[in-house]
Amino acid sequence: MTKKIILPSPAKLNLFLYITNKRADGYHELQTLFQFLDFGDDISLEVNESGEIELLNAIEGVAKEQNLIYRAAKLLQNHTACSKGAKIGVTKRLPMGGGVGGGSSNAATVLVGLNHFWQTGLSLEQLAELGLSLGADVPIFVRGFAAFAEGVGEKLVACQPRESWYVVLKPNVSISTAAVFQDPNLPRNTPKRTLSRLLSEEWTNDCEKVVRDHYFEVEDLIAELLQYATFRLTGTGACIFAEFESEAEAKAVFAHKPHNIFGFIAKGQNRSPLHQMLNLTTFPQ
């Protein structure tokens, strides 16, 4: 492979998020549902025999050793003792700190893509285990299927929620995930429910009230758009989203977003666009 290959690095949403317990070690147990979107960044890969990892558009002021894309490539290269190299570029569309998985998705696309084109032969499960050291959400993107997560996020069950249309908006604020989980008003005893029951119920997010109480930018945007649609938080934010049955309905609401707010329209995907493109088998069939 000498030509440049462009691979999708999709966004994700947490369609619901419930916190069921705080453990003695400080970690929170949760129940959440991840779904991919047909919108995201693009990762370009150009494999070569140099043995070097070159970032084509490194982030200014960030050492390459701290860049998740570089770290993912080096991790796979070292783990498999691969002698090949690659030039890697990224076209960013996803907002930083939006809670839609940009960095984790980029790392996963690099792991999956280079494993494929370097022919290093790791299974998706092996790649997911490797990717966990890069971030808690990386295995979701590596496995490539919409998933119900429990525990501290490590117990995954593939599932197929409805593939709706979404309007996703990014309030002009950065939110500290750590601060949200340390907040004394955060619910920590939501009863555990079975996946089948959760899929039949209306979905909410236990973090949303805390975030809306502390970040007026999120509260004001949700309130402003309430006359058009009910938006809710994904993860700990900052992005919010609303669900629609059709693209036309989504476009009609999107037209009312404030001009200074970044946003996009996307369709839910239970199989990652990356895995669709590479025709990879996802877990479990």
Curated annotation (Swiss-Prot):
Q: Which Gene3D superfamilies match?
A: 3.30.230.10, GHMP kinase, C-terminal domain (3.30.70.890)
State a single Gene Ontology molecular function.
Answer: ATP binding
The entry's ATP-binding residues are 95-105
> What Enzyme Commission number(s) appear in the record?
2.7.1.148
Keyword flag Transmembrane helix: no
Q: What's a BP term from Gene Ontology annotated to this protein? A: isopentenyl diphosphate biosynthetic process, methylerythritol 4-phosphate pathway
Enzyme class, first EC level, given as a word: transferase
Q: Which domain of life is it from?
A: Bacteria
| Disulphide bond pairs | none
Catalytic machinery residues: 12, 137
Signal sequence interval, chain numbering = none
Pathways involved: Isoprenoid biosynthesis; isopentenyl diphosphate biosynthesis via DXP pathway; isopentenyl diphosphate from 1-deoxy-D-xylulose 5-phosphate: step 3/6
The family database entries (InterPro entries) matched by this protein are listed as: GHMP_kinase_C_dom, GHMP_kinase_C_sf, GHMP_kinase_N_dom, IspE, Ribosomal_Su5_D2-typ_SF, Ribsml_uS5_D2-typ_fold_subgr
Q: Which UniProt keywords apply?
A: ATP-binding, Isoprene biosynthesis, Kinase, Nucleotide-binding, Transferase
Q: Which NCBIfam families match?
A: ispE
Describe the function of this protein: Catalyzes the phosphorylation of the position 2 hydroxy group of 4-diphosphocytidyl-2C-methyl-D-erythritol.
Kindly provide the name given to this protein in its UniProt entry: 4-diphosphocytidyl-2-C-methyl-D-erythritol kinase
Q: Per UniProt, what is the name of the gene that codes for the protein in this document?
A: ispE
